A protein has these predicted regions:
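Signature of dsDNA virion morphogenesis modules
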Residues: 1-152
Length: 160
């Protein structure tokens, strides 16, 4: 299951984080997938193939199907009841209030250097673009590594 876990849009807290400033190495060393940022509970899976594509951070999630909660969350993702992911990051190492980095609606700073700590599958994340994507025609999950599927996803004429 491929999730977009981050893009550079303004989050619900009013700030944004530049993808170019992301340090993904700490996460790659311990690629836990949590449910709703609950780090006091066992992970529900692990992240693989952590990568940056087109200004977004994508992670392939492998759910722990041997774990009851992991299996339950995997089922909800498979059936389309959960589609969102969220990054858990350490407090930014560098931020900027440079107006050139601000987007419309942005009230807070821009994090220019930050470290990814974990990723979570969650009902509602603070970045509304951090989603698993589904094809409107088939209601099946889009494989973000499939170029043709992305073309269909972005072709607005065929969505309605």
């Amino acid at each position: 299951y491929t999730f977009c876990v981050h893009d550079e849009s303004v989050n619900t807290y009013g700030f944004r984080m530049l993808t170019s400033g992301a340090n993904l190495e700490e996460y790659r060393k311990n690629p836990v997938v949590l449910y709703n940022h609950n780090d006091w509970e066992a992970p529900i899976g692990r992240g693989e193939n952590v990568r940056v594509e087109g200004g977004r951070i994508l992670v392939d999630v492998v759910f722990d199907e041997e774990d009851e909660k992991g299996r339950m969350i995997a089922g909800k993702v498979e059936r389309g009841f959960l589609r969102m992911a969220s990054i858990g990051a350490w407090p930014p190492e560098e931020v900027s209030d440079d107006p050139a980095l601000k987007l419309p609606g942005q009230t807070g700073p821009t994090a220019t250097k930050w470290t990814m700590r974990e990723m979570s599958v969650c009902p509602i994340g603070s970045n509304h673009n951090a989603l698993a994507m589904y094809d409107r025609a088939t209601n099946k999950r889009i494989d973000l590594s499939d170029g043709q599927a992305l073309v269909r996803l972005m072709d607005k004429k065929k969505q309605y």
